[in-house]
Amino acid sequence: MTHDYIKRVSARQVYTIRHIMGIEATVETECGIKAKAVCNAGISVGSHEVSFLYDNDEKWNGRGVTKAAESANTIINDVLRGMDVTRQSDIDYTMLKLKNVASNAVAAVSAAVLKAGALSLDVPLYQHIGG
């Protein structure tokens, strides 16, 4: 098995199919793989759900997520660059230890890393998840 490492993490605000703003994260690897994932808030927010970072400005009734996307573009990108894309647990643990990072950005990046890891190993996503 060859190793593939994270080259770049980027994120942007997108308008989702549920008619709310979400974060689309893209993970690029050294071997040229690109994987994307979108995270948006649920219809109802339960007590065990992560709290999302919203812009709280006039645009999108305060529900924009450009600040959250920026935390992925800066903090998360800097920390994950060079990590083995197939080491999902290590990557998630690293992101969970970060301070001042939006949970919605972490969720989107984690899902994009998961997809990139499966592509890197050339296995179906379900197989990568299940080991």
Where would I find each of the regions flagged by the language model?
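Short beta-strand elements
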Residues: 23-31, 35-41
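Short, Gly/Pro- and small/polar-rich lid/capping loops
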Residues: 1-22
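Metal- or metallocofactor-binding catalytic centers and their adjacent structured scaffolds
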Residues: 43-123, 127
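A generic structural signal for short, solvent-exposed coil/turn residues
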Residues: 3, 17, 29-31, 117
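N-terminal glycine-rich phosphate/pyrophosphate-binding loops that anchor nucleotide-derived ligands
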Residues: 24-26, 125-131
